[in-house]
């Protein structure tokens, strides 16, 4: 990211108020080192990483299989951060990160590509675990000087938000479970449909390169300056946020597993990240940025699917695998045979649905779904062949919000708890609830999305909003 700009550019940019969809458009027009490297079909994932990592400085990991777009997404997001503010961990000797500590401490962001390799380096692994906890990394080094008494010197690497990528198919790879709980994880789209879109886009790019850029350089510079301004505001200290709408969300968040206690923090960060990105359109109350109802909707639209799947312990492609199973039917005390599927049958059904996965990957997903209770496992015959059927735990979760009603509720809440900001909140946030969808750019009135009904969602082409979590 080039940060050189004239004083005139900076002054003119003060009135520029971008939408999150402008960031999506930027991802369609990414250039790195003069090369056109756009990202298509991963809009929500890219926006999620942008809001969590760039805006809110939340450690993040992008998971996928080989060729799933991990590095492409990471590089696109990183291109919005000034070069002088980011550091890339290049794996060397065990102590190499400590030798480079002064350079790391000068930066604001860290990129750790190929996490599976980082986990094999003890010092890097412990460094990332400390950062995941929000802690500074420390170590003591013995100093020996001839003729003097030995001494101990303490070395530190300050806390940094880090972004990393992880290849799922590497059999020797692992993510330390302590680290996994402390970072937000994003899964890329590995469907056959997405592969077809990527192929189509790349072929179109070489056929009509003059038509591929859909955002001019001046607009890109305005967006960069806007982000640079926010990064400057938050370089020393992150601001505090006040979200009166937050309590309304608790009715929609799965509470089956205790892990949701951790993941709620990531949803809060994405909501706050939206408020921070729209800083010019938000106001402060008692030195806190007041989050708008729209920011809550943006966060559900962008992060909703992966947030709910994470809370429900559904692994990557787990929802798709569950859809392959027939309804469980019990006669007497026995589950009917036709309710069970073997690994090769699941693999074939996934293939027909557009997901080409090796049997080992299918087994891993089935194992995780069984551990969580979504599937039941049975052993058949002398060979003890594993078969699976739907378990007792349902992955369905009603998450719809009646936005018109909830807007009235939040206004009543503010009148009671924060009467001093009621007038400004109502005027700035509640008079016009027509917003731009951050994914597809459509104009949507939140008040028209009533009761979370699928027909309303389909008509507005915003299923990812998760007013109702898509059922198996």
Protein language model features and the residues they cover:
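Short, hydrophobic-biased segments on the C-terminal half of alpha helices
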Residues: 78, 268, 363-367
């Amino acid at each position: 990211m080039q940060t050189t700009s004239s004083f005139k550019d900076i002054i003119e940019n003060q009135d520029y108020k971008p939408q999150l969809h402008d960031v999506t458009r930027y991802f369609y027009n990414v250039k790195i080192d003069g090369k056109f490297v756009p990202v298509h079909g991963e809009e929500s994932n890219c926006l999620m990483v942008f809001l969590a990592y760039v805006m809110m400085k939340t450690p993040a990991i992008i998971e996928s299989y080989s060729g799933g777009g991990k590095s492409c997404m990471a590089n696109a997001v990183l291109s919005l951060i000034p070069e002088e503010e980011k550091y890339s961990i290049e794996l060397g000797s065990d102590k190499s990160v400590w030798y480079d500590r002064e350079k790391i401490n000068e930066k604001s962001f860290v990129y750790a590509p190929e996490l599976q390799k980082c986990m094999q380096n003890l010092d890097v692994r412990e460094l990332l675990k400390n950062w995941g906890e929000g802690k500074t990394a420390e170590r003591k080094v013995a100093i020996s000087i001839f003729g003097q008494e030995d001494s101990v010197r303490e070395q530190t690497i300050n806390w940094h938000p880090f972004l990393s990528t992880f290849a799922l198919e590497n059999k020797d790879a692992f993510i330390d479970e302590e680290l996994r709980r402390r970072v937000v994880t994003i899964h890329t789209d590995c469907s056959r449909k997405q592969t077809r879109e990527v192929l189509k886009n790349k072929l179109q790019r070489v056929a009509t390169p003059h038509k591929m850029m859909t955002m001019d350089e001046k607009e890109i510079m305005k967006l960069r300056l806007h982000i640079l301004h926010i990064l400057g505001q938050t370089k020393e200290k992150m601001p505090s946020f006040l979200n009166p709408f937050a309590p309304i969300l608790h009715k929609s968040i799965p509470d089956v597993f205790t892990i949701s206690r951790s993941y709620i923090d990531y949803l809060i960060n994405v909501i706050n990240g939206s408020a921070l990105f729209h800083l010019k359109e938000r106001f402060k109350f008692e030195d806190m940025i007041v989050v708008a109802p729209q920011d809550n909707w943006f966060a559900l639209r962008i992060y909703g699917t992966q947030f709910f799947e994470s809370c429900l312990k559904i692994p990557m492609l787990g929802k798709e695998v569950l859809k392959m199973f027939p309804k469980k039917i019990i006669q007497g005390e026995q589950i009917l045979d036709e309710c069970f599927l073997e690994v090769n049958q699941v693999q074939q059904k996934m293939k027909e649905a557009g997901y080409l996965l090796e049997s080992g990957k299918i087994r891993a997903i089935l194992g995780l779904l069984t551990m969580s209770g979504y599937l039941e496992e049975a052993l058949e015959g002398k060979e003890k062949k594993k078969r699976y059927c739907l378990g007792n735990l349902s992955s369905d979760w009603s998450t719809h919000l009646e936005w018109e009603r909830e807007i009235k509720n939040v206004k009543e809440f503010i009148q009671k708890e924060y009467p001093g900001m009621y007038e400004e909140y109502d005027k700035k946030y509640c008079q016009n609830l027509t917003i731009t969808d951050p994914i597809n750019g459509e104009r949507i009135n939140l008040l028209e999305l009533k009761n979370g009904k699928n027909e309303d969602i389909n008509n507005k082409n915003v299923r990812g909003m998760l007013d109702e979590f898509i059922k198996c």
